[in-house]
């Protein structure tokens, strides 16, 4: 018996148009995008090209018009506030400023989302050990967050994004505050995570990082031009 091999995209954007605030100038004009499981999508573009706005749509911070933004074929314009919150819990996010809790150790920061969801401690331990297979945390997991370097803080941020096995990870300019060596370390972690099946959306304007990813990862490029 013949079966159809249908792939449901995680995210679909169809003919999305949006103008700059207080302007008729188009930020997006009939914009289309499809994000599938296992993708490593790299989004680039100059300032004011729409990168930040795209991230806001993807994390559910901005509401798109009906029939333009879909999560697993469901129109997100129809999502209630509670459904948006559930959707956000299925996303891992990491940003340039890390967003870590300074009164917690790195390990506590990483497992905190699971504690909020009342995940059993045995499951938390298993998930934490799985993350450590991707990121070497042995030298920093009980350290004082305030004493960590930028690269070490970003490792904690990635681990926290990965630990609840999200549908996809949004990394918005994650290397913006890092030196070249730390940037390459973060890139290698993202590549390892993607090779293990994690879906990545990386927003960056770092040319050295882009060149490294082109040579070492199977990426899809999206350049926003405005």
Could you tell me what each predicted segment is?
Residues 67-75:
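Conserved ABC transporter NBD signature motif
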Residues 104-111:
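Short coil-to-helix segment of the ABC ATPase nucleotide-binding domain corresponding to the Q-loop/switch region
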Residues 59:
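Helix-to-loop junction immediately C-terminal to a conserved catalytic motif
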Residues 169-172:
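Catalytic Walker B motif of ABC-type/P-loop ATPase nucleotide-binding domains
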Residues 165:
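Conserved catalytic motifs of ABC-family nucleotide-binding domains
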């Amino acid at each position: 018996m013949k079966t159809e091999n249908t792939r449901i995209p995680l995210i679909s954007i169809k003919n999305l148009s949006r103008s700059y605030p207080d302007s008729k100038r188009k930020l997006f004009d009939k914009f289309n995008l499809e994000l599938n499981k296992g993708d490593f999508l790299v989004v680039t573009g100059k300032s004011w090209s729409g990168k930040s706005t795209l991230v806001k749509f993807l994390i559910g911070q901005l509401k798109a018009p009906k029939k333009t933004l879909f999560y697993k074929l469901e129109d997100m314009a129809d999502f209630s506030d509670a459904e948006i919150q559930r959707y956000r819990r299925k996303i891992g996010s990491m940003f340039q400023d890390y967003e870590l809790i300074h009164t917690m150790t790195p390990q506590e920061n990483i497992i905190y989302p699971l504690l909020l969801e009342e995940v059993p401690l045995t499951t938390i331990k298993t998930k934490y050990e799985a993350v450590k297979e991707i990121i070497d945390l042995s030298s920093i997991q009980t350290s004082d967050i305030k004493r960590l370097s930028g690269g070490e803080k970003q490792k904690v941020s990635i681990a926290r994004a990965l630990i609840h096995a999200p549908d996809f990870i949004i990394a918005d300019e994650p290397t913006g505050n890092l030196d070249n060596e730390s940037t390459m370390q973060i890139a290698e972690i993202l590549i390892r995570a993607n090779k293990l099946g994690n879906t990545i959306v990386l927003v960056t304007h770092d040319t050295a990082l882009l060149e490294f990813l082109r040579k070492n990862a199977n990426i899809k490029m999206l350049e926003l031009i405005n």
